Amino acid sequence: MALTDSKKKATSKRKRDEPEQEQTHTLTSQLEMLTDEEGDDDNAGDVSDDGEYDEFPEIDAESDSEEEDEEEDEEDEEDEPDISDEEDSDSDESLHVFPKAKTVVSDITGQQKRVYPEIEPDYDSDSSTEDSPNRVGNVPMHWYDDLPHIGYDINGKRVLRPAKGDELDKFLATIEDPDSWTSAFDKKMQMDKPLTSEELDIIQRLYAGENPDATYDPYEPMVEWFTGKGKEEIMPLSAAPEPKRRWVRSKWEKQKIMKIVRAIRQGRIVPNKPKTSSKQFEFYSIWSSEPSSSQPPPLPAPKRPLPTNAESYNPPEEYLPTEEEKQEWLKQDPEDRERDFLPQKFSSLRHVPAYDQFIKERFNRQLDLYLAPRIQRVKLNIDPNSLIPKLPSPSSLKPFPNYRSLLFTHPKGRARCVSVSPDGAWAVSGDEDGVVSLWEVNVGCEIRRWKFEGKIGSLEWCPRADACYFAVGIEETIHFLIPPNLDPTVLALTQTLLAPSTLPPAPATPSAVKWSSSSLSSWSVEQPILSLNLPPSSGLPTQISWHKKGDYIATVSSGGAQNGVWIHQFTRRHSQAPFKKIKGAVQQVLFHPIKPHFFVATQQYVRLYNLAEQKLIKTLQPGIRWISSMDVHPSGDHVIVGGYDRKLCWFDLELSEKPYKVLRYHSRAIRSLHFHPTYPLFASSSDDGSIQIFHARVYNDLMTDPLIVPLKILRGHQITDGLGILQVKWTPKHPWLLSAAADGTVAVWCS
């Protein structure tokens, strides 16, 4: 094949050179034809360095037809195997480019196979630097910080972490080991490895700012790729036609030239200006200019405003003030006056007296220039009424209570608590003398009076419509009373609920609260039908809170924190303390009107618990030093909290744990808060002897904020011993309000 290829190349070259040989007959006549053996030894067509031409090898005559070429190719192919075999044998014996293979018998197939020796790569090999014992790949090595090994080798075995010395070993290594200064830390092997001479040479070159390649020659001769002899560019790089701007005068150059022409005409540019000798020494004054300062120069002083017609000695009549304007100007503060003087009128200039404020005005002017900043502050004349939010008129938000219709009196003590029946016809109130009075709301007539030993802490009417009774809290006891003159059906249901003939089974866990009910045969209206004896040292019950359905009642006592809160169930006749440990002293508790949630107000926080799941939902942060009262909106989404520091906080439970709005309308401590069950109203009472009535409209749209409008301030109670109105309650069906005060009176406020 090699001989055949050489013959074909020679034949094709001969065909290309025939036209050239005819034109340069004189040149080819000097060439000598060589034999086949000589042609194989020399390079065809090369020119020697001394200017003589090399001799061409012998070229066979080309065939006349394609058939002869095909026959010659077939003959060459027949002779080719022998030639290639001989060449292969000669090359194997003479040149050992590749390692020799050994012929062995395979243990698996039993046939002969060639086995080559293992390749030992040098430094130039691609695999010499990649053959690392640790084959974990390009992963962060801090994954192996807590492991005894640092990776795996090619066989899947662990590569153990090399031992590391302390700081003393590192210091000794820098002194004793000469290779420590030429070593680098290998992250993959977690050890120091010495750098090779090639790597050190690269570091030195980079440090010196040289090319890191050692074979780079910055002074190699230039290779003329495009400008050498015979390599010149003849055709243009771009054959685009010439643009029109080549023959049109430039508009911008014309403007620049005209600018120079105008400067020459005006004399700002002198074409033939005489040259002055720069060697001539010029004298100048060293004190002509002040030394430069790094600080910016001071701002110039503001100029005095020019006088107006009002400052004339004979101003027009419209500039002269009247007596009312003079009095108003004198009453104003000097900084609020529009002018510092009052215009005056004189018949002539000689009648004008000396300006009495001249020295003061000059002194203020000097102070302004010396001390005042260079700024003019204009006082904003804003109407304070424009800053007040626009609220609807209270007359459009009626009905709400605005006058006192009747007054019920407890002659021997403070009226601490009051409550209204679910139908709104009856009211019950208690004082510190232990007297509980039942009276009619419309006329104030007292129907029944009960006397207990000890002061009344709290009382509350049961919210059930099919039963009629109320609870009274005295020292460590809760009594349940039935009012007289009830319907027989309602009375029978109430007696069955409070004193059933068959008691429910006792609970598995005994309670510290003892339930004791009177027998129906010996019971009378003058005595309680049911009593709950709280644990000892519980103290006075300060609050009684009913669940909406009337089956549960929660009490808060003034005793210890562990026995302070109790929840009682009537159907099971069982009492339990919902909290084993309470953070802070409990002030008030409330049931959620819709959900099984429980509000607990301590001194500074209001916590919302889920009684069904027994977990804390959220903690409200009113920012009050000491919480005194609390109430929940009938929708259950809003809570109002009052404190002894005169703050009233409105919370939106869906919005945030911080108050939505804080109201400060009372001058003294807030004692009681209450939402109206049906009307958009709520009231707050305080020790200042006043009752604040607010309109509180809550929208179903969550994107609309509640509307809170103050409506009326009710005053009708006397402040006694620093205490004012202790509790307020709304009637369920009318916009009427009942208030119990420290002066021993209970008032009914009607619309």
From Swiss-Prot:
| Keywords of the record | Nucleus, Repeat, Ribosome biogenesis, rRNA processing, WD repeat
Name of the coding gene = ERB1
- Cite the InterPro entries for this sequence: BOP1/Erb1, BOP1_N_dom, WD40/YVTN_repeat-like_dom_sf, WD40_repeat_CS, WD40_repeat_dom_sf, WD40_rpt
Biased composition range(s): Pro residues: 294-305
One Pfam annotation reads WD40
Keyword flag Hydrolase? no
Record-given protein name: Ribosome biogenesis protein ERB1
Q: Where is the composition biased (Acidic residues)?
A: 34-92, 119-129
Q: Where is this region: Disordered?
A: 1-140, 289-336
Q: Which domain of life is it from?
A: Eukaryota
The family database entries (SUPFAM superfamilies) matched by this protein are listed as: WD40 repeat-like
Q: Name one GO molecular function term.
A: ribonucleoprotein complex binding
